[in-house]
């Protein structure tokens, strides 16, 4: 198994790398140093899109990569990566009513997809000012997790192996973060 971890110039990327590399080979590449044809050529089995500053339009080649490869290679987006997936499928990314940087929140899971074997509620660390607008959520995406206030914390594509989490599974304060990443790795 070989994963490409697309780095959106974020300090959390290597926490993700550390967790993922305990299960498989991981190559970290910056978001503007790779494109979909190179990903196909290198025969990666899965794609993980890291957190990062800014919004999806500022994430190098990530939007194009998801658009071109979501039917071919499983994808997991974390924080900014989650927002990229939402935007690719037509959801709007908006400013959150409350900015959440370095705070832990209760996450309410629907226990499906990469969250299937977790408790219905768990604590997770959040660092974000943008969110997927629930009112414009794509019909192609399902909500897999939310906060108590209904902020989308997890999504998955209805027909393809594409997942996003707004929270940070790589944070030490996210109780089941390693399990979530493992679920993505082992999911067919």
What are these regions (language model features)?
Residues 1-4:
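Extreme N-terminal starter segment of soluble prokaryotic enzymes
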Residues 13:
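Active-site-adjacent helical/loop segments in soluble small-molecule enzymes
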Residues 26-31:
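Short hydrophobic/Thr-rich beta-strand motif most characteristic of the beta2 strand and flanking loop
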Residues 34-44, 136:
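Short amphipathic alpha-helix with an adjacent loop that forms part of the alpha/beta core around
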Residues 41-117, 121-123, 181-182:
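Cysteine-nucleophile active-site neighborhood
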Residues 113-160:
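Catalytic beta-strand/loop cores that center a nucleophilic Ser/Cys/Thr
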Residues 169-188:
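Acyltransferase
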